[in-house]
A protein has these predicted regions:
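Short beta-strand/loop segment that forms part of the nucleotide-sugar
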Residues: 14, 18-31, 53-55
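Catalytic donor-sugar/metal-binding loop of nucleotide-sugar-dependent glycosyltransferases
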Residues: 140-141, 162-165, 174-192
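Short, well-formed alpha-helical segments that are part of the catalytic scaffolds
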Residues: 1-15
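Terminal low-complexity segments of carbohydrate-biosynthetic enzymes
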Residues: 5-8, 21, 39, 212-227
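Acidic helix N-cap motif at the loop->helix transition within catalytic regions
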Residues: 1-5, 34-42
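Acceptor/aglycone-binding surface of glycosyltransferases and processive sugar-polymer synthases
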Residues: 51-71, 76, 88-167, 193-204, ...
Length: 227
């Protein structure tokens, strides 16, 4: 149900962006068991400037993002989710922030100039609390570490290996880049609750996962090697 909305949104984005950029799209299907891959092929498979990638199994959103980055043939690569929780037009402000000394620009709804719309209070509290902990560990002091809406320098991220599945892997990507010396900046952004579908995030499991990742990244920082 999200794909027709995504197609219409990306058509508008391409029209807005093509005056400044050579826009190309990579669509990654993360081993779906429904008709997602067929619909993606129908909508985008034959379009100029579009590439489709299918993962053999569901490996999590971070693995899907990395697959898309590796499949891209440009040095600047942007990642968005298919239900457009963030407005892709915000990339017009984010892409110029990827200057020569920056390896990643992440959307930041928890930035003082950012905004969240219709997001449950428990999710806000959880996300801000986790950001506080990551801020104490990592070199790049950010307000938001959990957004998957980002702009990457391909050469800085394509060799990153993640071990976590789900959205936890998105944080692991950022953490591993941070501990490898990458400079990461954030752009104030507007976050809305998922427009299509229901979030499957389980609070207790999410907290345990983040605490485990924080522990491993702490060991990595102390020991100076992967954990």
């Amino acid at each position: 149900e999200a794909l027709p909305y995504l197609r219409n949104t990306l058509d508008e984005v391409q029209a807005d962006f093509q005056k400044r950029y050579d826009v190309r799209f990579v669509f990654v299907d993360d081993g779906s068991s429904d008709r997602t891959w067929e619909v993606v092929q129908e909508m985008f498979g034959g379009r100029q400037g579009c590439k489709t990638v299918r993962q053999p199994r569901n490996s999590g959103v971070a693995a899907a993002i990395l697959a898309g980055i590796r499949a891209a043939d440009t040095e600047v690569v942007c990642s968005i989710d298919c239900d457009c929780t963030y407005d892709p037009r915000q990339l017009l402000e984010m892409i110029p922030m990827l200057t020569d000394d920056v390896d990643m620009v992440t959307a930041s709804p928890y930035h003082p100039q950012g905004q969240v719309l219709n997001v449950p209070e428990w999710r806000l509290t959880l996300s801000k609390g986790l950001s506080f902990l990551y801020r104490r560990l990592l070199h790049n002091r950010l307000a938001t570490y959990t957004a998957c809406f980002r702009v990457y320098r391909k050469s800085a991220v394509e060799r990153v290996q993640v071990t976590e599945g789900g959205y936890l892997g998105v944080v692991e990507m950022l953490a591993r880049m941070d501990l490898a010396g990458s400079r990461i900046v954030e752009a104030p952004a507007v976050l809305e609750v998922r427009m299509m579908g229901q979030s499957k995030m389980k609070v207790a499991r999410t907290i345990r996962g983040h605490l485990g990742l924080l522990a491993r990244m702490t060991r990595t920082r102390i020991q100076g090697r992967p954990s």
